[in-house]
Amino acid sequence: MDVRMRRARRADDDVMWRATLQTVWDDIPADERVRLNRDKWEAHFRKKIEPYMAGDRTERWIAETADHELLGYVILGEGGFITPEAQGFIYDVWVAPDRRGKGVGKFLVEWASDWARQRGYRKIKLEVSETNARARHVYESLGFRAERRYMGKPLE
């Protein structure tokens, strides 16, 4: 697979925002999502992640073909606020729908691992939804293991 990586530009913002918003919306547990107004949620979420999407706290990378066809993107930065050792962190990884299942996600995660290694990090982490079995399978095949689990309990 011939993949070119380049820094994201402002011209990429629209597709990155749309993809991120849809991915996160889909990951919200169903019992929470039914109570949310999509437009209000998007406005709230945009405020929360703007520094990450703008690249203020992260590096945004686009994967594309030699003909500049979008394959996916990855947003990388530093994590590790639980321990004193800084770690690489994959804030978002997204693959174009027509490229899923073709190795692009695996390529992006391996590329992100190299990115972290080159910066001296000894570990890279990410967060994935319990319901995203396909992504979890890719991450586990690349050596990622579950370390923490977020749990929720409805109070109604």
In which residue ranges do the predicted regions lie?
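Conserved N-terminal entry element of GNAT/NAT acetyltransferase domains
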Residues: M1-D14, Q22, D31
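Conserved GNAT-fold acetyl-CoA-binding loop/helix
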Residues: L21-K48
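A short helix-loop-beta-strand connector motif used in the catalytic cores of GNAT acetyltransferases and
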Residues: R33, R46-I62, F89
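Conserved beta-strand in the GNAT
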Residues: R60-I62, E69-E78, F89, W94
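A conserved beta-turn-beta hairpin within the catalytic core of GNAT-like acetyltransferases
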Residues: E69, G79-I90, R100, E147-R148
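Conserved beta-strand-loop-alpha-helix junction that forms the acyl-donor binding cleft
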Residues: P97-R100, R122-A135, G152-E156
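Conserved active-site alpha-helix within GNAT-family acetyltransferase domains
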Residues: K102, K106, E110, Q118, ...
